[in-house]
Amino acid sequence: MKYVRCVLLTGALFNIAAGLKCADSKVLSRYKVSQHAAKGKFTESTPPSETTDFWWINLCEEHSEPVPDKCKDDAMFCHRQQVKLDDGKEYVTQVFDVPRNQEVDVEELRDGFQVSFTGKWGERERKVKVRYTCADDKAEDEVSAEGAFGAHTTPVEVALRGPSGCIQATEKSSGIGGWITWLVIYAVLLTLIYLLAKSYMSVGHGSMQDFREEFVERSTNLVSSLPEFAKEVMGKVVGGGPSSRGGYSAV
């Protein structure tokens, strides 16, 4: 597969141990990859036979899904090639799987992230690169690959497009909205502290009943003045000038 890698300036390679929860990874924990396993199937006419490649990827151990036929039970990645002859008989010709105890490199990209790892296929070691990109409109990840698996000198490159490459909803909702929420909370707390302090100073050594009445009165006055205050502020913001107020008559 050919693509241009656009690495974020703040992005770095994070090395984690495969089999650990994706929640423990600084990058993977931001995405929905722990909620899905991806699988793909590609059939090609190879006279006098028909060749089918099956791909299966379950990167995070948080997501439980049965491993496909012929793949090892501890696999997080599996490729199986199957040949169907013209007489209808089918034979599995290749199986390449990578166990969960293999180390995984995680790289955050501009439009998703990429994981890479190495597995053993017979006497050879094969490098695998899997790139995840977001597609909110898809319920499952679409898997695509380029080039013949038998090209031993090149990495196995697989692309996943779907929900796994999308950022978690909690991450999307953070930002300016989150800051505004905290500012409102702090404003309410500071106002409450101010009212309590002023009420206490006003009653001095009075009873608890006096303190409560003073606090309720101050709080009521504050709440009742908020609409007029907001109206005055909005008037100044939109250029209407200060609100009209009645003055005091000289006696």
Curated annotation (Swiss-Prot):
InterPro entries, per database record: Autophagy-rel_prot_27, MRH_dom
Record's bilayer topology term: Single-pass type I membrane protein; Single-pass membrane protein
One Gene Ontology term from the biological process aspect of the record: pexophagy
A GO molecular-function annotation: phosphatidylinositol-3-phosphate binding
Residue stretches spanning the membrane: 176-196
Cytoplasmic side: 197-251
Pfam families referenced in this protein's UniProt entry, alphabetically: ATG27
Gene Ontology terms: cellular component: clathrin-coated vesicle; cytoplasmic vesicle membrane; Golgi membrane; mitochondrial membrane; phagophore assembly site membrane; trans-Golgi network; vacuolar membrane
Places the protein is found: Cytoplasmic vesicle membrane; Golgi apparatus membrane; Mitochondrion membrane; Preautophagosomal structure membrane
Keywords: Autophagy, Cytoplasmic vesicle, Disulfide bond, Golgi apparatus, Membrane, Mitochondrion, Protein transport, Signal, Transmembrane, Transmembrane helix, Transport
Residue pairs linked by disulfide bridges in the UniProt entry: C22-C60, C71-C78, C134-C166
Topological domains, Lumenal: 20-175
Domain MRH as annotated: residue spans: 20-168
Signal peptide segment: 1-19
Annotated function: Effector of VPS34 phosphatidylinositol 3-phosphate kinase signaling. Regulates the cytoplasm to vacuole transport (Cvt) vesicle formation. Plays a role in ATG protein retrieval from the pre-autophagosomal structure (PAS) and is especially required for autophagy-dependent cycling of ATG9.
Similarity comment: family membership: Belongs to the ATG27 family.
The protein's name: Autophagy-related protein 27
Organism: Eremothecium gossypii (strain ATCC 10895 / CBS 109.51 / FGSC 9923 / NRRL Y-1056) (Yeast)
Lineage, highest ranks first: Eukaryota, Fungi, Dikarya, Ascomycota, Saccharomycotina
Gene: ATG27
